[in-house]
Amino acid sequence: GEKIYEDFNLSATPGQIIGVTGAVACGKSTLGKTFLCEYPYEGRICFHGKELSGMTKAEQNGMVGYLGHDPELFNDSVRNNILLGDDDDPEKYLKAVCFDGEVAEMEEGMDTIVGNGGVRLSGGQAQRLALARTLCHKRPVLILDDPFSALDRKTEEEVFANLRKLAADSIVILLSHRLYLFPEMDQVLWMEDGKVTAGTHEQILEKFPEYARLYEAQADGAEAHSTQEGGPDHAEK
């Protein structure tokens, strides 16, 4: 098949959050799914010196956690969607994603049934519930595909700060078209014209005019309109 990108090098350590962005249809989601071995690749993807493609499926699942931009929620309670049968405290993860207040106001609380795919929740609520589950079952590497796309900026900032604390022992690869928080990323990957360039936010800002244009437009408050129905959620406190 045709190559989507080439000449891509990245080294990361636990505790780092790496922001990945680029123009529309640049291959962000494909890059994320490459870490799930859903796409063939040339070269090596190594964790602790072990090649990803050489691991068993169980080893891969134990190494990489993935949250897609379409939350996969079950027709079950808020609690069970987070815990998936584990013995843990779901409240901690609801607080981390700024969803605890809204759940507390629901008539059935954590026992509220969310419907297949979270149809009984708003887009932002479903997104935060799926992120809470991902954090409850976190892996050494977490791939998060546009996890904040349905959130307002204030909630996004709070959830990001909590993510850094809860995932301090993981490598987080955050794919996003929203760049508010990219100055806080430990590394930024910019995808353009089939190439992926790694650097700090400042380095990418200086080197790539399109990245600078997108970042400055959003920093000035000219955020691109969400394509999701209903627009960004405003989390209740």
Show the residue positions of the predicted features.
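Helix-to-loop junction immediately C-terminal to a conserved catalytic motif
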Residues: F35-C37
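The feature captures the beta-strand-to-loop junction immediately N-terminal to the Walker
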Residues: T21-A23
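Conserved ABC transporter NBD signature motif
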Residues: G43-E51, Q60
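C-terminal portion of ABC ATPase nucleotide-binding domains
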Residues: A161, K165-A168, P183-K237
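ABC ATPase nucleotide-binding domain helical subdomain, centered on the C-loop/LSGGQ "ABC signature"
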Residues: R44-C46, R79-N116, F160-A161, D169
